[in-house]
Amino acid sequence: MQDILLIKYGELALKGDNRSFFENKLIKNIKHALSDFKEVKVEKTHGRIYVECDGDIEEVIERLKKVFGIVGITKAKKTDLNLDEIFKAAVELMKGHEGKTFKVETKRPNKSFPYNSMEVSRRVGAAVLKNIKNLKVDVHNPDVLLNVEIREMAFVYAGVIEGIGGLPLGTNGKATVLLSGGIDSPVAAWMMMKRGVEVEAVYFHSPPYTSERAKDKVVDLCKVLSQYGQRIKLHVVHFTDLQLEIYEKCPPKFTTIIMRRMMMKIAEKIAQKNGSMALITGESLGQVASQTIESLYVTNASVSMPIFRPLIGMDKTEIIDLAQKISTFEISIRPYEDCCTIFVPKHPATKPKLDKVIEAEEKMEYQKYIDDFEEEVIEV
């Protein structure tokens, strides 16, 4: 009898001819997450992925809870195809559940096993009742569902630890996220990673108006995001000169929207170089002046690449709740200004017209900044 973890996945099972691609990517990501555990083996057999580990199983579970594509993690016992061994595993798993109700459910893909599913369930239930006091059977609404699977080996398990869900990272291409250091953009990056998208990040740094601590905050956000499966390449773009050019030469009501358009143009150039197929932002409809539907239309027109906005229909409370869940919130609220919070006009345009914004942009020579920006690349 051996302690193992059964890995449950949801959407992957619906992927038809591509199912093996998604499963193999998930296995690769699990191995990466557990790469510093010496005594760990990850295997796939008959539509099941399981992890064998001789070390700290609780720490292994914590790592697996951050692997996209896993919907559930189950502590299980793997035994030989022997009823006595299955009984021992079932009794071991049910210890600590005294006073509760339970039900045994058996699946028997291995039809060569001499007992059918109903007979296995009946015999396992009887063994549990014989060895553990104060248990009752409830086939309709049990407190504990004890599962037995008869495959090339027997698997016995009860209860599921919730996983993070989504699709395995790396199954849906790459995108570049504009990471400001605020609450929203790291959540947006995380949501796209959950859909299988690898990310690189761009941060616009405006010294001396923004401090090194503001940049450090973004680096720390990337460190948190990297815990979900990949090292993140952060492009730190020096934005001061272009931002001052905008502030000095453009009408105040358009400075914010023009700044956003310049950021998009630079981010698109970086994205094209790194193989990204889209940009990601943390914009939420109507949250600020630059996030009205008119402003987003004008922003979109600055680039040809798709812009994904996974937070578009969320309110601030929902975004904060998710930021807290993924452990980025406390970093995001550190009191260091980023380039989006400096030079903010008193009355920004909320319904800008594209032709008027382009006319305002032409008052400055922005193309040289787009073509020859200075960047620092940090791999986190």
From Swiss-Prot:
Keywords from the UniProt entry: ATP-binding, Cytoplasm, Nucleotide-binding, RNA-binding, Thiamine biosynthesis, Transferase, tRNA-binding
Annotated GO biological process: thiamine biosynthetic process; thiamine diphosphate biosynthetic process; thiazole biosynthetic process; tRNA 4-thiouridine biosynthesis
Enzyme Commission number, as recorded: 2.8.1.4
Pathway: Cofactor biosynthesis; thiamine diphosphate biosynthesis
Catalytic activity: [ThiI sulfur-carrier protein]-S-sulfanyl-L-cysteine + a uridine in tRNA + 2 reduced [2Fe-2S]-[ferredoxin] + ATP + H(+) = [ThiI sulfur-carrier protein]-L-cysteine + a 4-thiouridine in tRNA + 2 oxidized [2Fe-2S]-[ferredoxin] + AMP + diphosphate; [ThiS sulfur-carrier protein]-C-terminal Gly-Gly-AMP + S-sulfanyl-L-cysteinyl-[cysteine desulfurase] + AH2 = [ThiS sulfur-carrier protein]-C-terminal-Gly-aminoethanethioate + L-cysteinyl-[cysteine desulfurase] + A + AMP + 2 H(+)
InterPro entries associated with the record: Rossmann-like_a/b/a_fold (IPR014729), ThiI_AANH (IPR020536), ThiI_fer (IPR054173), ThiI_N (IPR049961), THUMP_dom (IPR004114), THUMP_ThiI (IPR049962), tRNA_STrfase (IPR003720), tRNA_sulfurtransferase_ThiI (IPR050102)
Chain positions recorded as ATP binding sites: 178-179, 203-204, 260, 282, 291
Predominant location category: cytoplasm
Localization of this protein: Cytoplasm
MF-aspect GO terms: ATP binding; CCA tRNA nucleotidyltransferase activity; tRNA binding; tRNA-uracil-4 sulfurtransferase activity
Record's GO cellular component terms: cytosol
Pfam family, one: ThiI
Residues making up the signal peptide according to the UniProt record: none
The THUMP domain, residue ranges: 58-162
Keyword ATP-binding attributed: yes
NCBIfam families hit by this protein: tRNA uracil 4-sulfurtransferase ThiI
Family: Belongs to the ThiI family.
HAMAP family on file: ThiI
Annotated function: Catalyzes the ATP-dependent transfer of a sulfur to tRNA to produce 4-thiouridine in position 8 of tRNAs, which functions as a near-UV photosensor. Also catalyzes the transfer of sulfur to the sulfur carrier protein ThiS, forming ThiS-thiocarboxylate. This is a step in the synthesis of thiazole, in the thiamine biosynthesis pathway. The sulfur is donated as persulfide by IscS.
Protein name: Probable tRNA sulfurtransferase
